[in-house]
Amino acid sequence: FVLPGNNLVTPSAECCSSLSAVNTGCLCETINILSSLPANAAFHQSAAGIFDIGLYMEAKANETRWSLFSFPRVFLFE
């Protein structure tokens, strides 16, 4: 998993290799889209702050897949 602020786990060599192979332009554009979602989505103001949106990266033998997900902040790692 690649989660912002997650300092609990040292990334594996496979994870580092997969991340280094990612097209940075594509990744930057994806992050820009993610960061604009709360402002552009039709969330009620009180609901907009209770979900975090992130990327899940799965790396398997020369194949990297990215998935968009959201989760309630109450389940974030502290």
From Swiss-Prot:
One Pfam family it belongs to: Tryp_alpha_amyl
InterPro entries hit by this protein: Bifun_inhib/LTP/seed_sf, Bifunc_inhib/LTP/seed_store
The keyword Cell membrane is annotated on this UniProt entry: no
UniProt subcellular location: Secreted
Tissue localization of expression: Tapetum of anthers.
Disulfide bridge partners, by residue number: none
Main subcellular location of this protein, as a coarse class: secreted
Keyword Transcription regulation: no
Keywords per UniProt: Secreted
SUPFAM superfamilies recorded: Bifunctional inhibitor/lipid-transfer protein/seed storage 2S albumin
Gene Ontology cellular component terms for the protein in this record: extracellular region
Stated family: Belongs to the A9/FIL1 family.
PANTHER family: PROTEIN YY1
Name of this chain's protein: Protein M6
Source species taxonomy: Eukaryota, Viridiplantae, Streptophyta, Embryophyta, Tracheophyta
